[in-house]
UniProtKB/Swiss-Prot annotation:
Gene assigned in the entry: blaL
Keywords: Antibiotic resistance, Hydrolase, Signal
Domain of life assignment: Bacteria
Enzyme Commission code: 3.5.2.6
Reaction(s) the record says it catalyses: a beta-lactam + H2O = a substituted beta-amino acid
Signal sequence coordinates: 1-26
Name of the molecule in the record: Beta-lactamase 1
Family indicated by similarity: Belongs to the class-A beta-lactamase family.
GO biological process, one term: beta-lactam antibiotic catabolic process
List of residues binding substrate: K270, S271, G272
Length: 325
């Protein structure tokens, strides 16, 4: 279902105000900022006062009784929309898009120098595993226990189908926690904490920094992998295109950011959902005929059994789309 109501219908009594770009709050790790999910860290206008976007996001908090964090950047002109963009949230399966990007960045492709000990056969390298490795929600890997899967196939499975076993196999290929963290630090991300395997990473206990990031950090990582070219690019052009193709094929986010933006805007995304009502989506959004917008929406509730809200993410996407048209 596509969400395209008017703002007044969408957010209730929020009055339409002039749209003013939000200023980033300043990136800091959880240990440096001391922020916990759902506390502070809100975007402000250039004049330091709450603006239309902020009021809309706070209306969403009230409407869904949840805590959303949003970071969006228009790569055309650098305009940002933020709300709790530097607070920590459990990232859930959204990390799988970055995981696929990290794999692409580390294997030999078209004669490029290998960043660290990758096999010469690159993305065609076959990873073998046993039945004991299969986790719930592993619709692709469960069919290939006998023959194994290539890195390319595992990346497709982890992004398009959110395959949990594929995520763990790729985590090992990257060198576990240390290797995954090293790749992100090469992108300039000193915020994200990648710690555990599926399905332990889904605990999402408030205040636990493990397996968390911020909307800003994840959006910046996704931008490096999926959008940037030239010196800022984390991937070669063909690898970047491959990652975007995998995200385009993901259908787990149809009710999220994709549902909130205009129908003719192409969305390449990766969603996530874990405990405490955590519902996330990170996306490259491509309006026709112009540079893309990179969006990260993360959200959580207050109790372990809180309901996740697809509509919250979709409506946050609508606010972003209306603000960055």
């Amino acid at each position: 279902m596509r969400i395209r109501p008017t703002r007044r219908l969408l957010l209730g009594a929020v009055a339409p105000l002039a749209l003013v770009p939000l200023v980033a709050c300043g990136q800091a790790s959880g240990s440096e900022s001391g922020q916990q999910p759902g506390l502070g860290g809100c975007g402000t206008s250039a004049h330091g006062s709450a603006d239309a976007h902020e009021k809309e996001f706070r209306a969403l908090e009230k409407k869904f009784d949840a805590h959303p964090g949003v970071y969006a950047i228009d790569t055309r002109d650098g305009q940002e929309i933020t709300h709790r963009a530097d607070e920590r949230f459990a990232y859930g399966s959204t990390f799988k898009a970055l995981q696929a990007g990290a794999i692409l960045a580390q294997v030999l492709r078209d004669g490029r120098e290998v960043r660290r000990g990758a096999e010469a056969d690159g993305m065609d390298k076959v990873v073998h595993y046993g039945q004991d490795a299969i986790l719930p929600n592993s619709p692709v890997t469960e069919k290939h226990v006998a023959d194994g899967m290539s890195l390319r196939e595992l990346c497709d499975a982890v992004v398009a189908y959110s395959d949990n076993t594929a995520a763990n196999l790729l985590f090992d290929q990257l060198g576990g926690r240390r290797g995954s963290t090293r790749v992100l630090k090469q992108l300039g991300d000193h915020t994200t904490s990648m710690d555990r395997y599926e399905q332990e990473l889904g605990s999402a206990v408030p205040g636990d920094p493990r397996d968390t990031s911020t909307p800003r950090a994840f959006a910046e990582d996704l931008r490096a992998f999926a959008v940037e070219d030239g010196e800022k690019a984390a991937l070669a052009p063909n690898d970047r295109e491959q990652l975007n193709d995998w995200m385009s094929g993901s259908r787990t986010g149809d009710a999220l950011i994709r549902a909130g933006v205009p129908k003719d805007w192409k969305v390449e995304d990766k969603s996530g959902q874990v405990k405490y009502g955590t519902r996330n989506d990170i996306a490259v959004v491509r309006p026709p005929g112009r540079a893309p917008i990179v969006v990260s929406v993360m959200s959580h509730g207050d109790t372990q059994d809180a309901e996740p809200h697809d509509e919250l993410v979709a409506e946050a996407g609508l606010v972003v789309a209306d603000g960055l048209k």
